[in-house]
Amino acid sequence: MNAVGFAWRSLVRQPARAALGVLGVAAVGALLLDMLLLSRGLVVSMQDLLDRGGWDIRVGAGELPGTVRIPNALEAAQTIAELPSVRAALVIRSATAQIDRSSGPPLRVSFQGVTTRTASRANSALRAPWTIMRGRDAERPNEIVVDNGIATEAGLAPGSEVTLRASCVADVEALPATRLQVVGIAEFPFEATNEHTAGGTFDALAAACGGNVGEEADLILVTSMGDADGTAAAIRAVAPGLRAATNSEVVGRLQQTSFSYFRQISSVLTTVTVSFAVLLIAVLLTVSVNQRLGEIAALRALGFSRTRVVKDVLSESALIVGTGGLLSLPLGLALASGLDRILKGMPGIPAALHFFVFEPQALAVHAALLVATAIVAALYPMRIVSRLPIAATLRDEVIG
């Protein structure tokens, strides 16, 4: 019988201890997998979210795009759009708004007004930063699209009319009432879980604000001809008062600031979980070996080599960790899904952003750490059996 088969029989003879080890590794392995998914989850998810719309450069007035409003944004967007390496530029201006309902208080929403600037007539069509789910996109000053939450709570559908009161200057100003037609239900990628968003053209926003919208904007999205880094440098040259950043640069800045906390938490908890797994398996194997010292000495006397009994102990560790590791995969993915829903409920977190993102490299690191755990946890028990004095142990067994 080979070492693995012999180790399996040893574990079957002690089902309670084996089950404790397997369940412990499964729990630790699930948490370990989640920490590995969390370590790069936000970075991968944010990169995908930024790239999804096709805009590879973001232009703003602050350190991070969208934090400070851009003065003379329409003029700046036109200047940017005339660069040879720019395909199109999209100006986004947000305003606080309320949508009246037939029953209940008004819905507080964020209204995004957008307009396209381009030097090419072929690229002049509006490319909104949202995805139409039902109906069509808003094209006229009296048309808007709303998210599914607004449609559900206000009982709206494509073709419905709403009374919207927008505030483009300050939240304390009197909100004028404007009748607009809902032409589509849209998905807004950066909308938070507990927020509502509506969208339309820049002219629709100006109409909703009674013309009091000004020339400021929150963000300018730019699509390059292919060279995002070179285009960002060209934008910084023609608009020195603005900050242009590629999607990768935006993610890099977030990784150094907002996302660094989760990476640190992931590293600490990964170290703790691996250490706990090593201690758990080492204790279980040591107790098992100490209870079977007489049996192991007898096997050595019958001809089992030192290498063979060491392999038996290592095989026991591998079976416990391997079985627990396999169980930890579905358990870890289920736990990650639940934790992701909880964390996405925090204020200001886009609903499309995920904290836990599966990557093949995370699975490879997970497997490597479990293999290392099985080996390290078995070192002390293997040392015990390798140095076991056969004659003295058998004599103690007979006397005892």
Which residues does each PLM region occupy?
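Peri-transmembrane interface segments
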Residues: 42, 230-279, 288-290, 299, ...
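Transmembrane alpha-helical interface segments in multi-pass membrane proteins
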Residues: 273, 286-288, 294-340, 365, ...
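Basic-flanked hydrophobic alpha-helices used for secretion and membrane insertion
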Residues: 131, 136, 149-245
